[in-house]
Amino acid sequence: MENVGTAASATPKRARARNRRGEGGRLREDIVAAAVALLDEAGDERAITLRSVARRVGIAAPSIYPHFPDQPAIMLAVVQREFAELRDSLRAAVEKAGADPRKRLYAVCGTYLDYAGAHPERYRTMFGGLWMPDLDGSSLTEADLAALGDETMRILVDALAACAADGQSASTDPPSDAVALWLGLHGLAHQRAVSPAFPWPEDIADRIITALAHLNA
């Protein structure tokens, strides 16, 4: 894995062509994409600095400020982007699974675990909280952080609630049970990442889902 210093000091890209009027949104997207690329390469959010991002995009660091007032704002945008990607993947999985509530719940959980396995650095950053600054010293607000993951959790809650309504789950409190299920999935995703040599049972995910979602036999 490339170390943080190497990623941050990588050869800068050629100077970026100046945006035409009305294309400022494209630069914002490029800044976020550059930050994600740095995270993927270094495996450490500390590689994402104003200078390293500017170098990757091919702009001067001050050009970032009209779009992001500080580094935490860039990190927030990265995490928001990844949650949106996860949300879209979960929605697609639900649609593909068909009408059966149990299949939909398994599709949501399986897609969640697949995302965590395919993007370990991004996943860790989304849920690790290591990048979150002291709110008094950054442009972020408590509301910014509290909203992260709301839509993805709602998909899980709805999937479990549908199982309960269909008589396939004994859950009497789908929102709370969905939180417990998420904790189980998150724990599995984390442990798979840090203990890849452990002999995980092939059906461990199914066991977690069945138990924590209170699915009927």
Annotated model-derived regions:
Residues 81-105, 137-150:
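Amphipathic alpha-helical linker/stalk segments
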Residues 27-36, 53, 78-86, 90, ...:
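Generic hydrophobic, amphipathic alpha-helix propensity
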Residues 118-139, 190, 194, 198:
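Amphipathic alpha-helical segments used for helix-helix packing
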Residues 115, 158, 162, 181-199, ...:
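Amphipathic C-terminal alpha-helical segment
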Residues 30, 41-73, 77:
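Helix-turn-helix
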Residues 91-121, 178-181:
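Hydrophobic alpha-helical connector segments
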Residues 1-26, 37:
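N-terminal intrinsically disordered/low-complexity leader segments
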